[in-house]
């Protein structure tokens, strides 16, 4: 039974990673999570932007980054420009403003494709976890540790777990698509 918990834990982790990835996909509204992957070289240490200052969303399409150390403003601005978020930062010497323009139809479709790709990657990971779990059970059967019936039962249980998490992934992707396509 311990293997099931292990398999389920891995599947939960995969879904959790997918949620984090989907948070970084911009969907018309400003979301501070899109900055999570951007790091700034702060005294020789790559540091996430959210650890360098206050990030706020004062308006639906604006993110304001107010660093605690004003000297790092230029570095933050440079890293945001180098990133793939597609927003040009406005630096006024005290804060950096990221103004999100309304998404074009073309950009919405690109973001939808990206969300679907993340979903497919997660499904592949789930299926890989399923395959590994079933292979372990088959090896146990081969070694005489479990019976044929136990193997069939285990395969069914693992498949049910897989179906559950694949459905959860589909639901997450569907929600994200609606969010992206919402005008």
Swiss-Prot record:
Q: Which UniProt keywords apply?
A: Cytoplasm, Protein biosynthesis
Q: Fetch the InterPro entries from UniProt.
A: Ribosome_recyc_fac, Ribosome_recyc_fac_dom, RRF_sf
Which locations, inside or outside the cell, does it occupy? Cytoplasm
Recorded GO CC terms: cytoplasm
- CDD domains in the record, alphabetically? RRF (cd00520)
GO terms, biological process? translational termination
Q: Which GO terms describe its molecular function?
A: ribosomal large subunit binding
* Pfam families linked to this entry: RRF
Task of the protein? Responsible for the release of ribosomes from messenger RNA at the termination of protein biosynthesis. May increase the efficiency of translation by recycling ribosomes from one round of translation to another.
Homology family: Belongs to the RRF family.
Q: Which HAMAP family match?
A: RRF
Question: Which PANTHER family does the UniProt record give?
Answer: MITOCHONDRIAL RIBOSOME RECYCLING FACTOR PSEUDO 1, RIBOSOME RECYCLING FACTOR
Name this polypeptide is given: Ribosome-recycling factor
Organism listed in the record: Acetivibrio thermocellus (strain ATCC 27405 / DSM 1237 / JCM 9322 / NBRC 103400 / NCIMB 10682 / NRRL B-4536 / VPI 7372)
Organism lineage string: Bacteria, Bacillati, Bacillota, Clostridia, Eubacteriales
């Amino acid at each position: 039974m311990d293997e099931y918990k292990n398999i389920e834990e891995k599947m939960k982790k995969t879904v959790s990673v997918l949620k984090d990835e989907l948070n970084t996909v911009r969907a018309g509204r400003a979301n501070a999570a899109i900055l999570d992957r951007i790091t700034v070289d702060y005294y020789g240490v790559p540091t996430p932007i959210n650890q360098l200052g206050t990030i706020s969303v004062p308006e639906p399409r604006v993110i304001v980054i107010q660093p605690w150390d004003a000297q790092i403003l230029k570095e933050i601005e440079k890293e945001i420009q180098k990133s793939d978020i597609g927003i040009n930062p406005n630096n006024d010497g005290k804060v950096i403003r990221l103004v999100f323009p309304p998404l074009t139809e073309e950009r919405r479709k690109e973001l939808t494709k990206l969300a679907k790709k993340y979903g497919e990657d997660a499904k592949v990971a789930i299926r890989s976890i399923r395959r590994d779990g079933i292979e372990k059970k088959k090896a146990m059967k081969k070694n005489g540790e479990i019976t044929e019936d136990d193997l069939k039962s285990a395969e069914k249980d693992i498949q049910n777990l897989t179906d559950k998490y694949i459905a959860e992934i589909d639901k997450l992707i569907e929600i994200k698509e609606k969010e992206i396509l919402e005008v």
